Amino acid sequence: MIVCDTGPIVSAINKGEKRRHLFAAELLARLGRKVVVPWPVLVETDLLRRSRGFPSAAIVFGESMATGVHRLESPNVADLELALKLGKRYVDSGADLPDLIVMAMAHHRKAQILTWDFRHFRSVVLKRGHHWPLLVSEAEIPIP
């Protein structure tokens, strides 16, 4: 199981990112239903696409989630509590609620994380010495 953050989804949708788009699209297609998209990530992706003038891309992504391309899951109360606890502890990190929910859901499901947001996912930790299990490293992601 892999919990997905917004960045890889946006790259998979945005052909303008060229090599990064191909990398993300191929990776997400290959992983299919192993990928869990938290509801906050679906909402953030929709808002980003629409705010940047791509409402049709937002609709297509929403429809793909409705047909089960990836697994759409809601955070539970324990996920929200952990996300809020991390958000309070790392208030100055810049991590937003969708990031924190991805972390919490991955922790509770013992899942890997797919993100491009390495700064936030490295600065927010459960405890000293903890590292989130990231599916890809910065070095693996092509420059757009």
Task: Walk through the language-model features, giving the residues of each.
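Short beta-strand scaffold positions
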Residues: C4, V36-V37, S74, L97, ...
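Acidic catalytic patch
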Residues: V69-Y90
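Alpha-helix capping/helix-boundary segments
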Residues: V41, D79, I101-V102, R119-F121
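Short, well-structured N-terminal submotif of metal-dependent ribonuclease cores
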Residues: M1-V37, R50-E63, R128, E140-P144
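Short active-site oxyanion
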Residues: L31-V35, V69-R71, H108-Q112
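Amphipathic alpha-helical segments within well-ordered protein domains
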Residues: V43-D46, L84
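Acidic, PIN/NYN-like endoribonuclease modules and their adjacent C-terminal/linker elements
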Residues: L72, M103, R109-P144
